[in-house]
């Protein structure tokens, strides 16, 4: 009744996924929809339910006059990156260290809750391509590597902020790393923060994700909504 969005995915009588969003206003005064929660029960994951939920959210948003949806996600979680950047076509412009403070749940306990803001500009060519099931995976060939994975550990390289693009690789499964080697998980968190936060603060954005698990971080202008 107040411009919010609530949806659920049912299998029989069981709710297996749900999403909730509300109106927001950015610093420039532009109205958007902020997706506060979207989740799929663990046993139903990897069935494209999450992406179907987001596409339903997009259709609802356009019907109600929104052209942008935002939400937070953990940039260290590889499946999050793949869903958001490849399946949905979002862009990322903001990085917030320890966004939620300490969280005691099984996924986050003991790890800083760094988050990025996914910005889903619903009418850009990138999103329209994703909507038509075009493969948005990109090649990192020829791009300098700022953060790589060697024997499961993060290795950073100093690359000038004046460069045009860099790659930042992610661990294969940070959730597993957190449960088995929390010190290594923290090392990954701080390394990715060190590479992403200064660049995004300087006007860069995450423009893509490669097939072998790296963010493409670009120092160029964002695409405008058509």
Model-derived regions: residue spans:
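A conserved beta-strand-loop-helix scaffold within acyl/acetyltransferase catalytic domains
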Residues: 1-42, 207-210, 220
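Conserved GNAT acetyl-CoA-binding A-motif
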Residues: 61-74
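Conserved acetyl-CoA pyrophosphate-binding loop and the N-cap/start of the following alpha-helix
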Residues: 44, 48-56
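Conserved acetyl-CoA binding element of GNAT-fold acetyltransferases
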Residues: 31-42, 164-180
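A conserved acidic, glycine/proline-rich C-terminal tail/linker
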Residues: 179-201
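Short, cationic low-complexity segments
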Residues: 132-166, 190-195
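C-terminal "cap" of GNAT-fold acetyltransferases
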Residues: 99-131, 218-225
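Conserved catalytic-core motifs of GNAT/GCN5-like acyltransferases
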Residues: 72, 82, 89-108, 208
């Amino acid at each position: 009744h107040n411009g919010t969005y609530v949806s659920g995915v049912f299998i029989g009588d069981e709710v297996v996924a749900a999403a909730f969003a509300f109106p927001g206003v950015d610093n420039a005064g532009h109205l958007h929809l902020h997706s506060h929660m979207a989740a799929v029960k663990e046993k139903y994951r990897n069935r494209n339910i999450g992406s179907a939920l987001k596409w339903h959210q997009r259709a609802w948003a356009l019907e109600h006059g929104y052209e942008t949806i935002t939400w937070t996600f953990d940039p260290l979680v590889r499946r999050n990156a793949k869903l958001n950047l490849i399946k949905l076509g979002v862009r990322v412009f903001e990085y917030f260290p320890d966004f939620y403070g300490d969280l005691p749940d099984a996924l986050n306990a003991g790890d800083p809750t760094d988050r990025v803001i996914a910005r889903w500009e619903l009418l850009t060519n990138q999103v329209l391509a994703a909507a038509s099931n075009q493969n948005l995976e990109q090649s990192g060939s020829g791009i300098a590597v700022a953060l790589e994975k060697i024997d499961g550990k993060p290795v950073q390289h100093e690359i000038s902020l004046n460069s045009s693009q860099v790659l930042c690789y992610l661990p294969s499964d940070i959730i597993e790393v957190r449960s088995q080697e929390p010190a290594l998980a923290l090392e990954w968190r701080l390394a990715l923060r060190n590479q992403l936060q200064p660049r995004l603060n300087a006007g860069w954005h995450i423009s893509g994700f490669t097939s072998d698990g790296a963010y493409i971080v670009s120092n160029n202008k964002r695409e405008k909504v058509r």
